Swiss-Prot record:
It is a single-pass membrane protein. The gene is tatA. The lineage of its organism: Bacteria, Pseudomonadati, Pseudomonadota, Alphaproteobacteria, Rickettsiales. GO terms for biological process: protein transport by the Tat complex. It comes from the Bacteria. This is Sec-independent protein translocase protein TatA. Keywords: Cell inner membrane, Cell membrane, Membrane, Protein transport, Translocation, Transmembrane, Transmembrane helix, Transport. The Tat system comprises two distinct complexes: a TatABC complex, containing multiple copies of TatA, TatB and TatC subunits, and a separate TatA complex, containing only TatA subunits. Substrates initially bind to the TatABC complex, which probably triggers association of the separate TatA complex to form the active translocon.
Amino acid sequence: MGMSFSHLLIVLLIIFVLFGAGKLPQVMSDLAKGLKAFKDGMKDDGNDNDRKNN
């Protein structure tokens, strides 16, 4: 039940309409920073669990 190309295109079009061309780069930058922070947090959480088990 993944997203097809047409669904992805519609979602991107809606995002473009909501945020406009001027804000889109800032929104994407903030999203990328958030994803990076989430991944780093998950990586740190895994390291904490390894230390607790030893």
